[in-house]
């Protein structure tokens, strides 16, 4: 038995200068797990609640002392003495103790930090790397794959202080044979994009996720700049590198008139018109994945978009599904989208996260493991991506240590598996729904 002997919570700082929750779980034998909760900027309305103090005299109201107190008191008292290797039991104890549908009593930030720290401590007690332990929890022990990165190299929307409406323009180094090669390709395109933007007199300041945040005349301009950067780096767009977008459509959807209002371009679209706007972009550029291409509440619009684009484009639900199996189940039944974005803190525990990944895979949907715009040095999502063989990861651009921490952990994992004589496959374009 890997007995929990101590649980510690503390307030630390994330990549946006806001507080977040970090937890330590200590076991008999001296094993310790340490984990921190991330935080989103564009959030789905049905996400589990991130508990903030609301005290304007401290961190502008964004302190997390209440969530930390829950870790140090109620949660600690409930799980000390329990077996850390019973992950589902530990998570359920916290969920039941919280007693709310959206974890608003303790906060998903408190529960998640403890959930992940517990898994890390349990893995250490078994002498396993975290990715291997996650595979065991997932019922897929020994089954790994390296994820295809979706690298956000131009930031807009809520992730940047610019006029670009679409939140993320991403590259996928699909021509790579290994994760390490994919990162090299991504880095080379990133640096060439800086040169392209500078040559046009544009800003090379970066947004929350490490991508550039220039003011551009249109979303098509962003894609054109990336195309030029890919070619300058010596790669072929559509063969070596493909494109992906996160529209974060809920951020520019006007619920009063039902229109998608792209103020950066001075255009407004109905739901169906916006789908056809995106369809035109996919004809001009090799865009193989579109995330949140409609507002989270516009299920009719999503159904239409899936009908129009779903046979050839991966349509990822983020704000749409919020890593929630109840919502995902409904989406699967109604034929909404064909992929889910997986964010730990949208649901608030490792066990529930694994359940969402399994449900998606069982239904033929893909699962894209994702960071949040507010991150820390915690690299757990790298282990999650490998340990569930999810196939894809979204963890930012080729700058900012909070993003690079995840890529570096993936490098370590890939190397460790190679040294052990059990290399994990890198799936390339096959990982993307509709591209196999």
Curated annotation (Swiss-Prot):
InterPro entries in UniProt: Enolase, Enolase-like_C_sf, Enolase-like_N, Enolase_C, Enolase_CS, Enolase_N
GO molecular function, one term: phosphopyruvate hydratase activity
Residues at the active site: 209, 343
GO BP: glycolytic process
Cofactor(s) of this protein: Mg(2+)
Residues bound to Mg(2+): 246, 291, 318
Keywords linked to the UniProt accession: Cytoplasm, Glycolysis, Lyase, Magnesium, Metal-binding, Secreted
Biological pathway: Carbohydrate degradation; glycolysis; pyruvate from D-glyceraldehyde 3-phosphate: step 4/5
Positions bound to (2R)-2-phosphoglycerate: 167, 343, 372-373, 394
Enzyme Commission number, as recorded: 4.2.1.11
Subcellular location: Cytoplasm; Secreted; Cell surface
Top-level class of the enzyme under EC nomenclature: lyase
Cofactor, free-text remark: Binds a second Mg(2+) ion via substrate during catalysis.
Family label: Belongs to the enolase family.
Function comment: Catalyzes the reversible conversion of 2-phosphoglycerate (2-PG) into phosphoenolpyruvate (PEP). It is essential for the degradation of carbohydrates via glycolysis.
HAMAP family named among the record's database cross-references: Enolase
Quaternary organization: Component of the RNA degradosome, a multiprotein complex involved in RNA processing and mRNA degradation.
Protein name: Enolase
Lineage of producing organism: Bacteria, Pseudomonadati, Pseudomonadota, Gammaproteobacteria, Pasteurellales
Gene behind the chain: eno
